[in-house]
Amino acid sequence: SSSSAASDVYKRQVYLDGEAFFDVKKDNGRTFQVVTELVEVKVLGTRFDVRVSEEDNMAEVVLESGSVKLNERNKAEDGVILRPGEMGRVSRQSGIEVRHVDLQLYTTWKDKYMNIESQKMENVMFMLSKRYHTEIRIEGEELKAEIFSGRFDIDQSLENIFETIDLITPIHYQQQPDGTYLVTPK
């Protein structure tokens, strides 16, 4: 997985393929815009995450603070305004869908440390899969529902993080031939 961006500073416009977190300061008279293959995000002053997945043919925008307006690319309709804690998912098939999300699940990848507070293990694995750009499958309903708290230095290898989790919640992890990981209870 990779991200690439090109920008036009005069227009305050960024073209994005991948994922990026933005902390945008208000500039009277000039909006900030992120353009992807599927969505245009118009901003005044805010903090938000944009992830584009060509593989899944969709884009996600998660708003941490402020507000943003989402429009499907090359569509004339009014679009949708997101509020903090909301995610807008845009796909060619279903248009724009908005739902409330736990920000911790979508924005911790940008920090040096991943702070996890009282999250279900399936959410922990979701955050790790985003950070390490690999699929992590978890088996066992009890393990999925297990509540976990911890702090990881994101410069560690995924295997080291699995070993740390194992000290608190007994797990077994195995890398599969296709490069994905399977996590099961011990």
Residue ranges and their predicted role:
Residues S7-K186:
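A residue-level detector for the "anchor" residue at the start of short, highly conserved motifs
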